[in-house]
Design a protein with these regions (language model features):
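Acidic/histidine-enriched, beta-strand-rich ligand/metal-binding domains
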Residues: 33-39, 50-53, 64, 122, ...
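Residue-level preference for beta-strand/loop junctions
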Residues: 59, 76, 88-90, 143
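Histidine-centered catalytic micro-motifs
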Residues: 77-85
C-alpha cells in the first residue's frame, strides 16, 4: 500500500478505498466514544502487564475510534496491510470485535497463517509495525462490525 492509498483509507467515509479496503465507516457518539476510551485504557493496562517491556515513549494516546462495517452483500474486506507509517506513527493496533454472526470476514495475520477466532466483545491487540501484516478476508454473509483505534 502506498501513501496515497493510506491517506484515502485514513480519511474515508462510506466508500471503497482503492481496492484495499471495502467497508463503511460510522462516526461514534460522544457518549459511546467515552465508553470505548475506558475500554482501551483497560486493554492497554492488561497489555502492559503481560508484555513488561512494552512502552510507547513519554506519552500514550489513541488516535480516536472508527466503527467499521464490512457488508456481506458487498464482500467487504481489507486486504493485507500494516498500520504504521512514518507520517502517522503508531505503536499498537486495537480491533474490538462487536459481533460474530457473519461468514467470512476473518481477521488474519501473515497471509492467513494465523486466524483470530471471532468472539463478540473480544479485542485483538498487536504491534502496528511491519512485522504484523494483517487483513480482513471478504465477508460472504451478514455484516461484520468492529471498532478500531491505534496507540501512538
Amino acid at each position: 500500500i502506498n501513501f496515497n492509498d493510506f491517506e484515502r483509507a485514513r480519511t474515508s467515509d462510506d466508500t471503497e478505498i482503492s481496492g484495499f479496503r471495502n467497508c463503511y465507516q460510522k462516526v461514534l457518539s460522544k457518549e459511546f466514544d467515552k465508553k470505548i476510551y475506558e475500554c482501551v485504557g483497560k486493554v492497554l493496562q492488561k497489555y502492559a502487564d503481560t508484555f513488561v517491556h512494552f512502552s510507547t515513549g513519554l506519552t500514550t494516546e489513541d488516535t480516536g475510534y472508527m466503527h467499521l462495517i464490512y457488508k456481506g452483500s458487498e464482500k467487504g474486506e481489507y486486504k493485507t496491510h500494516t498500520d504504521h507509517f512514518d507520517l502517522y506513527p503508531r505503536v499498537l493496533s486495537c480491533s474490538f470485535i462487536l459481533n460474530d454472526k457473519y461468514d467470512g470476514g476473518d481477521f488474519s495475520f501473515f497471509d492467513g497463517e494465523h486466524v483470530v477466532k471471532k468472539k463478540t466483545g473480544s479485542v485483538v491487540v498487536f504491534p502496528s509495525n511491519f512485522c504484523f501484516p494483517h487483513a480482513v478476508t471478504p465477508v460472504t454473509n451478514g455484516d461484520r462490525h468492529a471498532i478500531i483505534t491505534w496507540i501512538r
